[in-house]
Amino acid sequence: MKKLFTIVSMTLIIPALTSCGGGPKGDMPWIVDRFDDIKVIRYEVPGFDALPLEEKELIYYLSEAAKCGRDILFDQNCPVNLPVRRTLETVYENYKGDRTTAEWKALEKYLKKVWFANGIHHHYSNDKFVPEFTEGYLLDAIETIPEEKFGSLNSLRGEVCRAIFDPALYPTKLNQKAGDDLLLTSSSNYYHNVSQAEAEAFYADMAAADAGNPEPVSYGLNSQLTKDDAGRICERVWKLGGMYSPAIERIVYLL
């Protein structure tokens, strides 16, 4: 029997859904959805309505800032996660065909799994999801939707399909098998076209250059290790003016 994982959705129960005594109504739909080994539930936050306005505003801005980091997490987990998610979301929002078929239900379930796991790999096993719908079905659904709905995603259609349906491509988000090159065999986007030996040597050289520092920093945090056009290893740092700058700018603004 599969282990049941639970998404706790922090839904604030508005006064209209509570009785005068402050308790939730018995018919409140606490279970929002369930698919595979996931159950989505909501719960009440006692006392939220009694908070001062300033504290409610603080919670709002913190939650908005967190949402701005969502696409960053998707991209960090695998380089194709965002194109896959956005393509499927466009289909989900615009498809006018029969939504009662088994293949549509399978596509919908796959998208929900991508939403929950922040990508195409299982949040616990790190294995890539196996679609229960066919590539032909997805392409047929895409063809029924005007191209302008997909925008720049049109040029990535082949890459998206390969990422979903080719079991040899991005098979695991995180490989920890002894003897394997853990970077080249993992699908996470923290390292791009860089081997484990190259990464270890890069950071060893960086640490050696800073050997006299009585308070050395940790290396390799908040960055992607990749190669420039000349093949030299370099870091793309997540910061204002660096990698993910538009999202980080918005986070800074909200905070």
Task: Give the ranges of each region predicted by the language model.
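C-terminal motif of bacterial Sec signal peptides marking the signal peptidase cleavage site
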Residues: 15-19
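Sec-dependent signal peptide recognition
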Residues: 2-10
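Bacterial signal peptide processing site
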Residues: 21-23
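N-terminal helix-rich structural modules
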Residues: 26-250
